[in-house]
A protein has these predicted regions:
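Glycan-recognition and catalytic cores of secretory/periplasmic carbohydrate-active enzymes
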Residues: 1-372
Length: 372
């Protein structure tokens, strides 16, 4: 990964101070029902419900309360948790209602569910909200898990099973988002362990370490899964398009954008499952070591905070902590509003962009230059 960093001139604060200042401004954004204004899917420009933004801010508000002990952040975090536990966004009592895009599921695959599970698990532990932890585990276990393939299925908001989510970063983020529940649930711990056991066989790389977009279990395993349950026929489609996408320049561009997303998820899993043998696997090491963060800076796919995502990977996998601050600063340069201390963007909804500061919750305190 590169050592890209902005100029060193300007104010230096700690990441904890940055989180608190950002959370202070977020209090003005929070609505009466505890939710935060929804953004738009920044890859496909599709309308979203408040689930994603509220989940991110729930993480930040609860963490800032844990850091500062200030009651106003506790109250705001509790209100956000209450919203995530409400019937409006789980209208049928199954999965979260995340988007309303023509021709697509409302659950937004596994990734749509990963964010509220992550938020409820994190905030539930800090706020001592067992109801939050219980719903997070409930939503996790609603998703069927194939022990042989090591993959989860999507479940629509009405409970309909939609077969496997074939997008690898969705599988990784669902496991990562649920990983904080592992200490609370043997079911969660066992399924994520199996997912990690199978990950090398489901993940394919380009020769330079770039992770390919789709999960790719072996053809034999895919055929067996379809025989067991015919609804899994899309797995066979993966195999049909695999070689075409391997040569597609547009697909490679997309995969570059999602590299920090994948590595962020792997970092979150490493922090919760540090002793698992997958971390010494050659595919994982190659993906971590072979890619340059600068390649992601002008890509309109994947992560909108690639520097912070790579910083989390550096923290989880590298002994060199000196690169963490410069990577964070890469995202702050040009994005941080120095009045509100919210992240902004010219190309992405500010509601989405500002909420992604929650990535810093998972890092220890660091001094960062925020410019002037």
């Amino acid at each position: 990964m590169s050592n890209s960093a902005p100029d060193s001139d300007g104010e230096t604060i700690t990441t904890y101070e940055l989180l608190e200042r950002s959370a202070e401004s977020a209090l003005e954004l929070q609505r009466e029902d505890g939710s935060f204004p929804p953004g738009r899917n920044y890859t496909y420009d599709e309308p979203e419900t408040p689930v994603r933004t509220t989940s991110h801010w729930t993480m930040t508000l609860s963490e800032v309360y844990d850091i500062t002990g200030k009651e106003k952040f506790q109250e705001a975090a509790d209100a956000a948790v209450d919203y995530l536990l409400g019937d409006e966004i789980r209208p049928h009592g199954y999965t979260y209602y995340c988007r309303d895009a023509s021709g697509k599921d409302h659950c937004n695959g596994l990734v749509g569910q990963a964010y509220p599970i992550r938020a409820l698990a994190h905030a539930g532990l800090i706020l001592e909200r067992q109801d939050a932890i219980g719903i997070a585990e409930e939503v996790f276990t609603i998703h069927p898990f194939d022990e042989e393939l090591g993959l989860w299925e999507r479940v629509e908001i009405d409970g309909k099973k939609l077969s496997f989510d074939r997008t690898l970063n969705h599988q990784i983020l669902f496991a990562a988002g649920s990983s904080k529940l592992a200490s609370e649930s043997n079911i969660v711990a066992d399924r994520i362990t199996t997912f990690l056991d199978r990950l090398p066989s489901n993940m394919e790389l380009h020769s330079d370490g770039l992770i390919k977009h789709y999960a790719r279990p072996s053809p034999i395993d895919a055929v067996k899964a379809v025989i067991r349950r015919p609804r899994h026929w899309p797995l066979l489609l993966n195999e049909m398009v695999f070689h075409y996408y391997s040569r597609s320049a547009e697909r490679r561009k997309k995969e570059i954008g999602y590299q920090p997303v994948n590595l962020k998820g792997l970092a979150q899993l490493r922090m919760q499952f540090p002793e698992h043998g997958v971390w010494s696997n050659n595919k994982i090491r190659t993906a971590l070591e072979a890619f340059d963060v600068d390649e992601c800076s002008d890509i309109d796919y994947g992560s909108i905070t690639p520097g912070m995502s790579f910083a989390l990977a550096e923290y989880a996998f590298s002994a060199d902590t000196g690169r963490i601050a410069p990577l964070i600063e890469m995202d702050l340069k040009g994005q941080l509003d120095h009045t509100t201390y919210l992240l902004t963007s010219d190309t992405v909804s500010d509601f989405d962009q500002s909420s992604t500061i929650s990535i810093l919750v998972e890092l220890p305190d660091h001094d960062v230059c925020v410019g002037s």
